[in-house]
Amino acid sequence: MDPKDRKKIQFSVPAPPSQLDPRQVEMIRRRRPTPAMLFRVSEHSSPEEEASPHQRTSGEGHHPKSKRPNPCAYTPPSLKAVQHLQTISNLSENQASEEEDELGELRELGYPQEDDEEDEDEEEDEEEDSQAEVLKGSRGTVGQKPTCGRGLEGPWERPPPLDEPQRDGNSEDQVEGRATLSEPGEEPQHPSPP
């Protein structure tokens, strides 16, 4: 038998009845990426990222997914930004060295060192100490009654509820309510109820 004489075997399989609507089949075909689309998508993405059909949603049709930059990802500064930072740092170094030169010249002429720098350091130390005291005061110590806050004059207590009548030290209700001593050594006398 010659190879030319061989017949091709063809299987005739009846096509299964399509359960999908022809419009749905067309939409699926449109969503399926073509090799050209895959090439276009991979051309724009970084080499590590592969374009996969899982990244697409059904509503996008045949357009490639628009990628948003990840806000958490590190993006290196541009060349212009680096050059700008270098010029700023060079300017600040030049200004600092000029100020040091001026101070050196003044000291050579006999001017004393400025006290402003020392005063600023002392003020910063005082601020840190006062902040530490405030923190210690807010924590309180064990067994101490907690206060609600610190006023300008010192700690203040929570005001009484509004439903109770306010009492100051001179009111008659408060004086009657307290036991009074008639003479030292005697027992307190309670006022008789009216």
From Swiss-Prot:
The keyword Hydrolase does not apply. It is found in: Cytoplasm. GO terms for biological process: behavioral response to cocaine; cellular response to cocaine; DNA-templated transcription; locomotory behavior; negative regulation of female receptivity; response to amphetamine; response to morphine; signal transduction. Dopamine- and cyclic AMP-regulated neuronal phosphoprotein. Residues 41-63, 160-170 have a biased composition (Basic and acidic residues). The modification N-acetylmethionine is found at M1. GO terms for molecular function: protein phosphatase inhibitor activity; protein serine/threonine phosphatase inhibitor activity. The modification Phosphothreonine is found at T34, T75. Keywords: Acetylation, Cytoplasm, Phosphoprotein, Protein phosphatase inhibitor. Residues 113-131 have a biased composition (Acidic residues). The modification Phosphoserine is found at S45, S46, S97, S130, S192. Residues 1-194 are annotated as: Disordered. Residues 84-95 have a biased composition (Polar residues). GO terms for cellular component: cytoplasm; cytosol; neuronal cell body; nucleus. Inhibitor of protein-phosphatase 1. Belongs to the protein phosphatase inhibitor 1 family. This is Protein phosphatase 1 regulatory subunit 1B. It comes from Mus musculus.
